Amino acid sequence: MNITNFAKKLAEKPVFKTRIKSDQVKLSEIAIGYFLAPFCAMFANAIFGAYLNRYYVDVLGWTKFGAFATLLPIVSVIFVVLGNLMIGQWIDNTRSTQGKARPYMIIAAPMLIIAIILMFMTPTKGNNAVQMIWIAVSYNMYYALAYPCFYCAHSSMVSLSTRNSESRGLLATLSNAAMVASAGVGASIVVPILLQSFLFVTKEGGIDVDASYSHWRIISIVLCLVSAFGCMLEYYFTRERITEETINLNVKEEKLPLKKQLEGCIHNKYWWIIILYFLIFQFGQLIKNSSMSFYVRWMFDSVINSANPEQTSGALMSTLGLVGGIPTAVGMVVAWPIARKLGKKRAVVTGLCFSVVGGLVCFLNVHSFGMVAASMVLKGIGSIPAMYVTMALLSDVLDHLEAKNGFRSDGFTMSVYSSIMVGLSGLCIGVLNSLLTFAGYSNTGIACNPQTLEIVENVANYTGQIVYRQMGGVEQVLAFAFLAADVITYAVVIILMSRLDVEKHIEEDQKKIKENQKKAANI
């Protein structure tokens, strides 16, 4: 039995019948299926996005493996892309009464449990080869298979849920809010406030590797269970009304080869624009997020001069996350009214222009917490439409492709989208690691005089005050990664998105889709 038949038979068991009965999108589906459930399912991944690289660097010490720390995340992108394309094909070739994407949420749940546990069971004793193999296999099991199995299906849900533009906009807003909230709560509240000193135990100015490793193993059990729970909750509280249309009309769907879907997408300029938007925008966000814990730990004097730098950096990181999260929270309410008034494309472009200007504020003083926090708020305000509206724009593009091609390309498109959202994480970690390594990053910092910044070579015999900080090259890398990268990508995206005019085709596309369905059903 192949995987698509297995997914169909599994989903059509009575126990896996959706709890959503209404033909219209209602509160339980909105609140649970598109916010609470994905929030839980993506919670662990949000923490990994902010802290997994630091776990590898400071706890497992993978910089001792030389180029491995840089090459693994970058090379793994190949496997992530292949994994997402494979899962996208599974989705497009699955047809069940419970949909074509949702069945893979069931399959993703146990896969996530296994993959997360393996990532944090890396043997710390023994030869380096065993550790490198374990890290490589577990890393790719999570990022190239388990998480894409959920995320590719999850990302398809807005476009498969309904053709009602208003409902789609609301679902896109809530779905993106869940992703943002999981990052805000996980990476900016739970870990920095409650778990920073637990997961990164300090000892003699450095990291207590054994204690930190033990604590990460405990937390991994909680994270894998929360992820699996979120997968199942989203499965039960969502519904694929678009997929049901063809089933109810008895439309016979052929299995679409990858080549046909590829040709149907790559010859359309709107598809390229929206995909390049996600690629560029996400690259800037991930470089920023991956460097945030490093930046807060090493760029603010209040942290460097603290008696407990890890605890202080955790508190400041939490504060920075909360301050930056204020516009994000407000955005849940105002994003769609703004998009209705201006149009989705204009809302995104106008907002990002504001973000570019706001992003320049922090360069008045990159060591000032106040300046950095103010800049984050301004960037957050401007990026509200980009964060909440673009999934609805992607749905419009998918409808436009369906009208032109006569078939939907959700699976392939969302596999590309998922490859970007998941695969870029590893690529950005690799880029950041290579920059930090080249600049001379040290996980304990360099002992120096706090006034003159002169390096103290012999700490044991030095009688003056000592602080541990990174040297100039590392500070420049962190300033670029955390403060400049996203501003640069915003500017590029503004130029790109100004050409996305798919909204003017919406009414014509919906009419054409209905005509195609009637022809296929011989009505």
PLM features: what roles do these ranges have?
Residues 2-523:
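Membrane-embedded alpha-helical bundles of multi-pass transporters/translocases
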